[in-house]
Every structure is written in structure tokens, then in C-alpha cells.
Amino acid sequence: MLSPDSQVLLLLCSHVGLAKDSDLTPLTLREWNPLARKIQASSYTRPERLLGQTVEEIKSVLELSEIEANRLAGLLQRSNLLAKELDRLDSIGIRVMTRADLDYPQRYRQRLKESTPIVLFYAGEPALLGQPGIAVVGSRHLDLAGQECATFIGNACGLSGLVLYSGGAKGVDTLSMNAALEARGSAVGILADSLEKMIRPSEINRALNRGDLCLATPYSPNAGFSVGAAMGRNRLIYCLADYAIVVASDAEKGGTWAGATETLKAGWIPVFVLEHAAMPEGNHLLLQKGGVAFPHPFPEHYNKLPEWLKENSLAPKPQAIQLGLF
């Protein structure tokens, strides 16, 4: 059941139920954050209090310009269209949560703070989001060592009860996710596009219905691929996990490189990098930047992986919890 606060966040900050030819544009993250602080400090105190308010009331209480108040009021007027589209999504197994929900992933609040996505669309078991696990990232094009490593990590997660986090794309993501599910484990895919399309295959649908898989995205469920979205979701993979393993990275370009270097700099979680004789140049450079070498072949049994990662981790930087609910 969508709370009134979440309804307002969806109306103001998503394209759900917004006509393609509409002159209105949803608020961006940078626009929403200062507005959220204004709402909290005002007599409204919560987003839900904006429902049913006039332009003049919004303008006065939040001390906005005429243009800003009209934009908010216009976005808030499509409640019926929002409800209709949410019903359609629910009928195909897609649901939504927002930063106003208490069950929103705490690790995003803790690590990303005001960069936390306002809205998450998901299919499957949302309780998996933020459970102990390993993020596996890398190129779509892998050599044999990379393929073996991705499969090994997926199997290890499945057999040791850890969630396998990935981006749900071809290559590393698919290999590791399939291995985790085949080992009767669980997996989370943070998608950059096409959630509606991703849930259609029967094997994916079965895993979603069993509660072994959750697919989530901060983007519209029917959004097509864009480089910007793919780059933007990389941090969302890392920030749910306890550890990250980079299987293969290009040097100083691409989403894998960007996500790994950002995580190393921010110190969200320990970053391991696959090390082997024919590893790509990007792996070499990530090791120089502070990544921890992950050996191939792994010298221990599958069930030793969690213990090995813990023993070989560099302590991540302490993170202050974001206190705001929305």
C-alpha cells in the first residue's frame, strides 16, 4: 500500500503517469533535496501535506516563486494517472518504494546520504536489498579466467548464504547471477534500464516468484538504455554489498572503472580486483589505486570465500547515517 508521503514523492520526482507530451518535468535529485528540507522545516513537516494544496498555499508556506509553486501544483494534479499506472505495473509484478518508506534500503541512506535515489522500482523480494553479500562487476566480454571467477563467486554466494549483487547485464553479471541461483542462493540485480523487459523470461520470473531474486532500478521500468543511467547505477550496486569483486575493467574508461574508482575513493566497501597473468590493464591500475588482489584460481573451497574476504579487507571508512526520512 502506497503511503501518502510516497505518493507525493512519486508525483513530484518520477515520470509515472506523466504524459509524454507534458510540459511538466519531475524534480531531479538536486531539486528535491532542498525542497525536502524546506518541507520538514515548514508547517507541512511531511510531503503528504502538499496534497490538496493550492498554488498560493504552496508558494506561501514553502516560500517559493510563482513558477516553482505552479510546477509543484501541476505535478501533484495527476494522482489518478499515477494510480492507474501503478496498478498496471503491479499487475505485471513491479512495485515501488521511496525514500519516505521505512523499509527503504538503509545502506543507501547510510552510504549515499543525499545522493540516495528518491524512487526505486522493483520486482521480486525487496528484503534482499542490503542483506549481506558480494557485488560482482566487470566487462561484458570476458576471458576464460574472468568467466571462471564470475561463476565461482556466484556459486560461493549461493552455497554460503550471501546475496550476489550485480547489474543484471550480459557477461559478468549474468554468469555470476545464474551461478548463485543455480546453487539455490539469492541475487539482486540493479538495472540501468528495461525492468519490464527483464522480468519476462520464465526462468527469471520463477526466481522472482520464489523470492530468490530481486531486480530493482531507480529509472522508469520501461526506460531504454542510456550511458548516463548505466554509469549512475554502478554506485547503487556497490552500496548494497559488503564487498566488491572487480572481475575485469577497462583502463580509465567505462562503467566498471568509474564505479570501482568511486568506491575506492569513497571507502564504502572493500574493493577486490581479480589478479591473474592475462588480466586487463584496468585491473592493474585498480590494484595500484588501492584495490585488493583477488587470486585466480582461488586457493580455498567455495565456503571459505566470506572468511577470506573478511581477513583480507582494508577497513572501510566509517559512514554517518542520514537521518532524514525523505
Tell what function each PLM region has.
Residues M1-T28, K84-I92, T98-F326:
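Glycine-biased, small-residue-rich flexible motifs in mid-sequence functional cores and linkers
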